[in-house]
Amino acid sequence: MKFATSPLNKAIHAVVFAFALTSGSQTLLAQASQTEFDLVPNAKFVDCLGVPGGPTPTAHVKVVRGRFSDTLTITADNIRPRLAFDMFTVQRSSLRANGTPDPAFKNFGLAWYQSDLQANSSGKFTATIKTILLDQIFGFDPDLSNPNPINTFHLGFWFNDPNDAAACGFDVTKPTPFNGEHEAGPLAMISKPNPTTKLGPLCTNPDTSTSPATCNP
């Protein structure tokens, strides 16, 4: 059955349709197609991460949004040759927005194992992963007292071998769980929170109408 449409109804439908298109465009524009950021060395262990007397280790990250998954590429330089690491996305950073240690930091929260890394003989490495990252990466455990989804918008990597950080004061009898054997060394480098939203750099579309800020998926 067809219904007659008056000129007024046609005008209303046109306005609603135009608004829907505009709203949709704004949502798409709010989500960046890619983002880039640098990781910051853990000051306690930077001398074991790089070559003594050499330039400061660096790590740059680029994430490109995809239709079904995102592509993250990490490139590092000035690393001590042949060192191995384990990369994770985590809920919290140990740093403040200015890159200094956060005195209120207690733990990294939820962590997702993403990739192994290893420097070559020149102290460089590059690795690429494809997974859900920008604005949506999360995990949850319904058995926990807080079963809600938890985002992991920070990125960091840990020394794979605790002995590689022993000369800088790491207690090798107390390894961290950040490798496949759960016998890793300390944090080597990690991302910083945004100074305004306090969210990690994998959130490109923050919602500042909430307190604390959240991320629009």
Regions found by a protein language model. Give the residues of each.
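Bacterial N-terminal signal peptides
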Residues: 12-24
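Sec/Tat signal peptide C-region and signal peptidase I cleavage site
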Residues: 24-30
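Bacterial N-terminal signal peptides that target proteins for export
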Residues: 2-15
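N-terminal leader/targeting pre-sequences
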Residues: 31-217
